[in-house]
């Protein structure tokens, strides 16, 4: 559970009441930035694991040791650290480390950015960042998205992260769609499991999943953050601050109302294309399935913005999104449960659920007090039917 913003004094007073329902339901940890918040949790919920947020800007073994000494069990180091620096901290301090492996990156130091607060009164340290780093800025004659960074993708280096002692992978997903969340978590779990099982073909596997994630969301490609190279212009997505898509062809002919596109990749009906030229962008929808090297005709619009030779990008891969929905999101894992229902007049109804199999888990749900039936009493078969409706 994330409570990793800076709180005001009057908000801290209400914090125990806010967290208590989640605590009673079994939340397994809380990530914090504010040391006052950490102190409140330690006093009111002493057995609740606390994790230090990347907003704390912990960048050394001394910071890690401090967090361990005040009772934190895990922390997310500054995103500006290299893998060697993270490995060094892990070798010296016995504390779990969680690092970012995928998603949007901040231009500023973790937890230190005041730009959104100054520019629009929305503090990033209060969870309200307006993302001014995704705006265009001018420097001399250059006018570009000078503070907009590419998204991070560490799929090809999952093994190196594990070998460095990193305990948990963190995926940035602010305001992202379910398909993004499902695909990224699935890809990293697959690579992690493959590496730990000794898979000999991780390169092809990582390339396949990276191509999938690039089709879902990327800003001018991906970068590896500060893990290896450090900062540099190669980290910037200065041409476009949002989803770039993937290049699938170019315009070869204009025959109103149609545009002919020579494909460099397979496309599918329902895909959304963007034709990009010097005059601007035009969004169109593909109505056919076609393979690379073929030419297709797509109904166009805003022809004053389109020229022969314009590059065409796919910003929505319809078949991929449908596959993710079907094979990952809707593919719920089923487990066998044992249910014990106790209902006695004058006593509170109790339902005990226990999982069957390798992962043992129990949960006790206490309901209202049982009373005599005013009309027809509930039968055992009816209760069993209701319980089975849960899945």
Where are the regions that the model predicts?
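Surface-exposed amphipathic alpha-helical tracts and adjacent flexible/coil segments at the periphery
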Residues: 1, 9-16, 20-23, 32-36, ...
């Amino acid at each position: 559970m994330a409570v990793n913003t800076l709180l005001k004094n009057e908000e801290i007073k209400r914090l125990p009441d806010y967290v208590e329902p989640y605590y009673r339901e079994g939340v397994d940890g809380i990530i914090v930035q504010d040391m006052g918040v950490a102190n409140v949790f330690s006093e009111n919920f002493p057995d609740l694991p606390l994790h230090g947020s990347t907003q704390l800007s912990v960048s050394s073994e001394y910071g890690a040791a401090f967090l361990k000494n005040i009772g934190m069990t895990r922390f997310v180091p500054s995103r500006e650290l290299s893998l060697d620096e993270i490995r060094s901290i892990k070798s010296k301090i016995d504390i779990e480390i969680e690092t970012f492996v995928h998603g949007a990156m901040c231009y500023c130091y973790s937890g230190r950015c005041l730009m959104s607060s100054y520019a629009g009164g929305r503090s990033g340290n209060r969870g309200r960042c307006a993302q001014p780093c995704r705006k265009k800025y001018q420097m001399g004659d250059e006018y570009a998205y000078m503070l907009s960074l590419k998204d991070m993708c560490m799929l090809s280096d999952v093994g190196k992260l594990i070998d460095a002692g990193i305990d948990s992978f963190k995926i940035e997903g602010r305001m992202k769609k379910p398909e993004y969340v499902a695909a990224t978590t699935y890809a990293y779990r697959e690579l992690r499991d493959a590496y730990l099982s000794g898979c000999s073909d991780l390169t092809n596997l990582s390339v396949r999943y990276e191509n999938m994630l690039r089709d879902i969301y990327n800003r001018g490609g991906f970068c590896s953050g500060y893990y290896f190279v450090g900062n540099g212009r190669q980290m910037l997505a200065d041409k476009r601050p949002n989803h770039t898509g993937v290049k699938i062809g170019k315009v070869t002919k204009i025959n109103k109302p149609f545009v002919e596109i020579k494909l460099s990749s397979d496309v599918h009906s329902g895909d959304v294309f963007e034709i990009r030229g010097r005059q601007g962008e035009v969004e169109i929808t593909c109505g056919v399935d076609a393979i690379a090297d073929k030419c297709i005709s797509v109904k166009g619009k805003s022809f004053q913005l389109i020229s022969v030779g314009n590059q065409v990008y796919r910003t929505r891969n319809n078949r991929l999104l449908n596959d993710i929905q079907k094979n990952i999101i809707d593919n719920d894992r089923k487990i066998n449960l044992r249910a014990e229902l106790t209902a006695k007049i004058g006593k509170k109804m109790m339902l005990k659920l226990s999982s069957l199999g390798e992962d043992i888990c129990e949960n006790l749900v206490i309901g209202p007090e049982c009373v005599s039936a005013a009309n027809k009493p509930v039968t055992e078969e009816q209760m069993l039917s209701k319980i089975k409706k849960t899945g």
